[in-house]
Protein backbone atom coordinates (compact mmCIF):
# COMPACT_ATOMS: atom_id res chain seq x y z
CA UNK A 1 0.00 0.00 0.00
CA UNK A 2 1.37 3.39 -1.01
CA UNK A 3 2.22 5.60 1.97
CA UNK A 4 -0.34 8.42 2.04
CA UNK A 5 -0.74 10.98 4.80
CA UNK A 6 -2.41 14.38 4.88
CA UNK A 7 -0.21 16.71 6.91
CA UNK A 8 -2.03 18.87 9.46
CA UNK A 9 -1.22 22.54 10.21
CA UNK A 10 1.51 22.38 7.59
CA UNK A 11 2.15 26.06 6.89
CA UNK A 12 1.44 27.08 10.48
CA UNK A 13 4.20 24.76 11.71
CA UNK A 14 6.79 25.72 9.09
CA UNK A 15 6.15 29.46 9.42
CA UNK A 16 6.74 29.29 13.17
CA UNK A 17 9.69 26.89 13.23
CA UNK A 18 11.84 28.13 10.34
CA UNK A 19 14.08 30.89 11.71
CA UNK A 20 17.27 30.36 9.69
CA UNK A 21 17.24 28.92 6.14
CA UNK A 22 20.87 27.82 6.62
CA UNK A 23 20.22 26.02 9.91
CA UNK A 24 19.80 22.48 11.23
CA UNK A 25 16.27 21.13 11.67
CA UNK A 26 14.96 17.83 13.00
CA UNK A 27 11.59 16.35 12.12
CA UNK A 28 11.16 13.96 15.04
CA UNK A 29 8.03 12.32 13.61
CA UNK A 30 8.90 12.12 9.94
CA UNK A 31 5.86 10.16 8.74
CA UNK A 32 5.51 10.49 4.99
CA UNK A 33 7.67 13.62 5.02
CA UNK A 34 4.94 16.25 4.72
CA UNK A 35 6.39 18.78 7.14
CA UNK A 36 9.94 17.90 6.09
CA UNK A 37 9.22 18.40 2.40
CA UNK A 38 7.64 21.81 3.05
CA UNK A 39 10.61 22.74 5.23
CA UNK A 40 13.15 21.50 2.68
CA UNK A 41 11.64 23.70 -0.03
CA UNK A 42 12.54 26.75 2.06
CA UNK A 43 16.00 25.66 3.17
CA UNK A 44 19.31 26.63 1.56
CA UNK A 45 21.59 23.95 0.07
CA UNK A 46 23.93 24.15 3.09
CA UNK A 47 21.10 23.55 5.59
CA UNK A 48 20.66 20.13 7.19
CA UNK A 49 17.30 18.40 7.65
CA UNK A 50 17.17 15.26 9.80
CA UNK A 51 14.12 13.01 9.72
CA UNK A 52 13.44 10.58 12.57
CA UNK A 53 10.77 7.88 12.57
CA UNK A 54 10.42 4.38 14.00
CA UNK A 55 8.24 3.23 11.10
CA UNK A 56 10.32 1.75 8.28
CA UNK A 57 7.56 2.40 5.72
CA UNK A 58 7.53 6.08 6.71
CA UNK A 59 11.30 6.35 6.29
CA UNK A 60 11.11 4.80 2.81
CA UNK A 61 8.24 7.07 1.73
CA UNK A 62 9.95 10.22 3.01
CA UNK A 63 13.23 9.22 1.39
CA UNK A 64 11.51 9.02 -2.00
CA UNK A 65 9.66 12.28 -1.47
CA UNK A 66 12.72 14.29 -0.44
CA UNK A 67 15.15 12.73 -2.93
CA UNK A 68 15.18 15.84 -5.11
CA UNK A 69 15.47 18.44 -2.36
CA UNK A 70 18.38 20.86 -2.55
CA UNK A 71 19.24 20.89 1.15
CA UNK A 72 21.29 18.23 2.87
CA UNK A 73 19.09 15.61 4.49
CA UNK A 74 19.34 12.27 6.24
CA UNK A 75 16.98 9.83 7.92
CA UNK A 76 17.24 7.87 11.15
CA UNK A 77 15.02 4.93 12.03
CA UNK A 78 14.52 5.37 15.75
CA UNK A 79 12.07 6.62 18.35
CA UNK A 80 12.19 10.33 19.15
CA UNK A 81 12.62 9.44 22.82
CA UNK A 82 16.28 8.80 21.87
CA UNK A 83 16.77 12.25 20.33
CA UNK A 84 19.76 13.11 22.53
CA UNK A 85 21.57 9.90 21.55
CA UNK A 86 20.67 10.42 17.89
CA UNK A 87 22.16 13.91 17.83
CA UNK A 88 25.20 12.78 19.80
CA UNK A 89 25.86 9.98 17.31
CA UNK A 90 25.73 12.57 14.52
CA UNK A 91 28.08 14.87 16.49
CA UNK A 92 25.43 17.60 16.46
CA UNK A 93 25.17 19.83 19.52
CA UNK A 94 22.86 22.71 18.66
CA UNK A 95 19.79 22.72 16.43
CA UNK A 96 17.61 25.52 15.02
CA UNK A 97 14.29 23.75 15.20
CA UNK A 98 12.44 20.54 16.11
CA UNK A 99 9.11 19.36 14.69
CA UNK A 100 6.76 16.89 16.41
CA UNK A 101 3.54 15.71 14.77
CA UNK A 102 2.19 13.23 17.31
CA UNK A 103 -0.36 10.50 16.81
CA UNK A 104 -1.06 8.00 14.07
CA UNK A 105 -0.52 8.82 10.41
CA UNK A 106 -3.34 8.54 7.89
CA UNK A 107 -1.40 5.72 6.25
CA UNK A 108 -1.27 3.70 9.45
CA UNK A 109 -4.99 4.22 10.01
CA UNK A 110 -6.00 3.37 6.46
CA UNK A 111 -3.76 0.31 6.13
CA UNK A 112 -5.83 -2.45 7.72
CA UNK A 113 -2.79 -4.71 8.06
CA UNK A 114 -1.33 -2.37 10.69
CA UNK A 115 -4.27 -2.98 13.01
CA UNK A 116 -4.78 0.62 14.13
CA UNK A 117 -8.24 1.29 12.76
CA UNK A 118 -11.69 0.33 13.98
CA UNK A 119 -12.90 1.12 10.43
CA UNK A 120 -10.59 -1.24 8.51
CA UNK A 121 -10.32 -4.87 9.52
CA UNK A 122 -6.92 -6.42 10.18
CA UNK A 123 -4.89 -8.33 12.73
CA UNK A 124 -4.61 -6.61 16.11
CA UNK A 125 -1.20 -4.97 15.98
CA UNK A 126 -1.02 -1.16 16.43
CA UNK A 127 2.79 -1.03 16.55
CA UNK A 128 4.31 2.12 15.12
CA UNK A 129 7.65 0.30 15.24
CA UNK A 130 7.36 -3.24 13.90
CA UNK A 131 10.39 -4.20 16.02
CA UNK A 132 8.36 -3.60 19.18
CA UNK A 133 7.51 -7.00 20.75
CA UNK A 134 4.31 -5.74 22.40
CA UNK A 135 1.21 -5.80 20.19
CA UNK A 136 -2.45 -4.95 20.66
CA UNK A 137 -3.19 -8.68 20.37
CA UNK A 138 -1.07 -9.42 23.43
CA UNK A 139 -2.67 -6.63 25.46
CA UNK A 140 -6.23 -7.60 24.58
CA UNK A 141 -5.68 -11.33 25.11
CA UNK A 142 -3.32 -11.47 28.11
CA UNK A 143 -3.75 -8.39 30.31
CA UNK A 144 -5.75 -8.85 33.52
CA UNK A 145 -9.23 -7.35 33.58
CA UNK A 146 -8.29 -4.66 36.12
CA UNK A 147 -5.29 -3.58 34.06
CA UNK A 148 -7.35 -3.44 30.88
CA UNK A 149 -9.96 -1.31 32.63
CA UNK A 150 -7.27 1.04 33.93
CA UNK A 151 -5.72 1.50 30.49
CA UNK A 152 -9.06 2.07 28.76
CA UNK A 153 -10.11 4.58 31.43
CA UNK A 154 -6.81 6.47 31.77
CA UNK A 155 -5.70 6.49 28.14
CA UNK A 156 -9.09 6.47 26.44
CA UNK A 157 -11.12 8.39 29.00
CA UNK A 158 -13.84 5.83 28.27
CA UNK A 159 -16.72 5.89 30.79
CA UNK A 160 -17.54 2.23 30.03
CA UNK A 161 -13.96 1.04 30.64
CA UNK A 162 -14.78 -1.54 33.34
CA UNK A 163 -17.62 -3.03 31.34
CA UNK A 164 -15.52 -3.19 28.15
CA UNK A 165 -12.65 -4.89 30.02
CA UNK A 166 -15.11 -7.38 31.49
CA UNK A 167 -16.58 -8.23 28.08
CA UNK A 168 -13.10 -8.59 26.54
CA UNK A 169 -12.05 -11.08 29.23
CA UNK A 170 -15.29 -13.06 28.92
CA UNK A 171 -15.03 -13.23 25.12
CA UNK A 172 -11.38 -14.32 25.06
CA UNK A 173 -12.15 -17.26 27.36
CA UNK A 174 -14.03 -18.77 24.43
CA UNK A 175 -11.53 -17.82 21.72
CA UNK A 176 -8.75 -15.26 21.16
CA UNK A 177 -9.66 -11.78 19.95
CA UNK A 178 -7.56 -11.75 16.78
CA UNK A 179 -8.77 -8.93 14.56
CA UNK A 180 -9.85 -5.32 14.85
CA UNK A 181 -13.37 -6.35 13.80
CA UNK A 182 -13.44 -8.90 16.64
CA UNK A 183 -12.51 -6.18 19.12
CA UNK A 184 -15.03 -3.71 17.71
CA UNK A 185 -17.79 -6.32 18.10
CA UNK A 186 -16.88 -6.92 21.74
CA UNK A 187 -16.78 -3.18 22.48
CA UNK A 188 -20.16 -2.62 20.82
CA UNK A 189 -21.64 -5.45 22.87
CA UNK A 190 -20.23 -3.95 26.07
CA UNK A 191 -21.53 -0.41 25.56
CA UNK A 192 -25.30 -0.04 26.12
CA UNK A 193 -27.31 0.77 23.01
CA UNK A 194 -28.43 4.18 24.28
CA UNK A 195 -24.77 5.20 24.76
CA UNK A 196 -23.88 4.16 21.21
CA UNK A 197 -26.49 6.30 19.48
CA UNK A 198 -24.69 9.63 19.75
CA UNK A 199 -21.09 10.77 19.65
CA UNK A 200 -18.03 9.19 18.02
CA UNK A 201 -17.60 5.57 17.02
CA UNK A 202 -18.04 3.40 20.14
CA UNK A 203 -14.61 1.80 19.67
CA UNK A 204 -12.69 5.06 19.22
CA UNK A 205 -11.62 5.59 22.83
CA UNK A 206 -10.71 1.97 23.49
CA UNK A 207 -8.62 1.73 20.33
CA UNK A 208 -6.84 4.95 21.30
CA UNK A 209 -6.10 3.56 24.76
CA UNK A 210 -4.68 0.28 23.48
CA UNK A 211 -2.58 2.08 20.85
CA UNK A 212 -1.12 4.38 23.52
CA UNK A 213 -0.24 1.37 25.68
CA UNK A 214 1.38 -0.51 22.77
CA UNK A 215 3.61 2.42 21.83
CA UNK A 216 4.06 4.00 25.29
CA UNK A 217 2.99 7.26 23.66
CA UNK A 218 2.43 9.25 26.84
CA UNK A 219 5.34 7.85 28.83
CA UNK A 220 7.92 9.05 26.30
CA UNK A 221 6.71 12.62 25.79
CA UNK A 222 8.21 14.80 28.53
CA UNK A 223 11.88 13.73 28.44
CA UNK A 224 12.31 14.33 24.66
CA UNK A 225 10.90 17.85 25.05
CA UNK A 226 13.53 18.61 27.68
CA UNK A 227 16.25 17.02 25.53
CA UNK A 228 15.24 19.05 22.48
CA UNK A 229 15.27 22.31 24.41
CA UNK A 230 18.74 21.49 25.73
CA UNK A 231 19.92 21.12 22.11
CA UNK A 232 18.27 24.31 20.83
CA UNK A 233 20.28 27.34 19.85
CA UNK A 234 19.13 30.57 21.46
CA UNK A 235 16.23 31.64 19.26
CA UNK A 236 15.66 28.06 18.09
CA UNK A 237 12.19 26.58 18.36
CA UNK A 238 10.26 23.40 19.14
CA UNK A 239 6.83 22.88 17.58
CA UNK A 240 4.47 20.13 18.72
CA UNK A 241 1.16 19.07 17.20
CA UNK A 242 -1.04 16.94 19.46
CA UNK A 243 -4.28 15.18 18.59
CA UNK A 244 -5.79 14.31 21.95
CA UNK A 245 -6.17 15.98 25.32
CA UNK A 246 -3.87 13.61 27.23
CA UNK A 247 -0.92 14.43 24.96
CA UNK A 248 -1.70 18.12 24.94
CA UNK A 249 -1.81 18.32 28.74
CA UNK A 250 1.63 16.71 29.00
CA UNK A 251 3.15 19.04 26.40
CA UNK A 252 1.49 22.12 27.87
CA UNK A 253 2.74 21.26 31.37
CA UNK A 254 6.29 20.49 30.16
CA UNK A 255 6.51 23.81 28.31
CA UNK A 256 5.07 25.74 31.26
CA UNK A 257 7.69 24.28 33.59
CA UNK A 258 10.46 25.30 31.21
CA UNK A 259 8.98 28.80 30.95
CA UNK A 260 9.27 29.36 34.70
CA UNK A 261 12.31 30.64 36.58
CA UNK A 262 11.49 28.98 39.89
CA UNK A 263 9.92 25.53 40.07
CA UNK A 264 10.10 25.14 43.86
CA UNK A 265 6.93 24.03 45.70
CA UNK A 266 4.81 27.10 46.52
CA UNK A 267 5.08 26.46 50.27
CA UNK A 268 8.85 27.14 50.26
CA UNK A 269 9.53 30.76 51.34
CA UNK A 270 12.82 30.97 49.41
CA UNK A 271 13.85 29.56 46.02
CA UNK A 272 16.29 26.68 46.36
CA UNK A 273 15.95 25.13 42.89
CA UNK A 274 18.06 27.74 41.04
CA UNK A 275 16.06 26.90 37.92
CA UNK A 276 16.25 29.42 35.10
CA UNK A 277 13.68 30.04 32.40
CA UNK A 278 14.58 28.09 29.28
CA UNK A 279 11.87 28.96 26.75
CA UNK A 280 9.09 31.37 25.89
CA UNK A 281 5.85 30.61 24.07
CA UNK A 282 5.50 31.77 20.48
CA UNK A 283 1.91 32.85 20.10
CA UNK A 284 -1.10 31.01 21.44
CA UNK A 285 -1.91 27.36 20.88
CA UNK A 286 -3.16 27.12 17.31
CA UNK A 287 -5.91 24.94 15.87
CA UNK A 288 -6.73 24.16 12.24
CA UNK A 289 -8.96 26.50 10.30
CA UNK A 290 -12.55 25.57 9.51
CA UNK A 291 -11.47 25.11 5.88
CA UNK A 292 -8.72 22.63 6.81
CA UNK A 293 -11.09 20.65 9.03
CA UNK A 294 -13.64 20.53 6.22
CA UNK A 295 -10.99 19.20 3.82
CA UNK A 296 -9.44 16.84 6.39
CA UNK A 297 -11.82 15.91 9.24
CA UNK A 298 -8.99 14.11 11.06
CA UNK A 299 -7.44 17.52 11.72
CA UNK A 300 -10.28 18.70 13.95
CA UNK A 301 -8.60 17.78 17.26
CA UNK A 302 -5.10 19.02 16.35
CA UNK A 303 -3.36 21.65 18.51
CA UNK A 304 -0.01 23.28 17.70
CA UNK A 305 2.21 24.67 20.47
CA UNK A 306 5.58 26.35 19.82
CA UNK A 307 8.28 27.53 22.23
CA UNK A 308 11.55 29.39 21.61
CA UNK A 309 14.83 29.01 23.48
CA UNK A 310 15.82 32.13 25.42
Q: Residues of each region from the PLM?
A:
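S-adenosyl-L-methionine-dependent methyltransferase catalytic core, i.e., the SAM/SAH-binding region
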Residues: 1-310
Amino acid sequence: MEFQHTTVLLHEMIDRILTDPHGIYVDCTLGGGGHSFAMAEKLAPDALLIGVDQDEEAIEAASRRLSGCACRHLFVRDNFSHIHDILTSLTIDKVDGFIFDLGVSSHQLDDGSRGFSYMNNGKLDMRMDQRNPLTAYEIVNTYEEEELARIIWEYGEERWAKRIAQFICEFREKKPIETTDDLVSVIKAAIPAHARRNGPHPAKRTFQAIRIEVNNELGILKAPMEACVSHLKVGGRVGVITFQSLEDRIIKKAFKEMERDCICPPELPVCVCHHHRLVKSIGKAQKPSAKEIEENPRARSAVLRVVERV
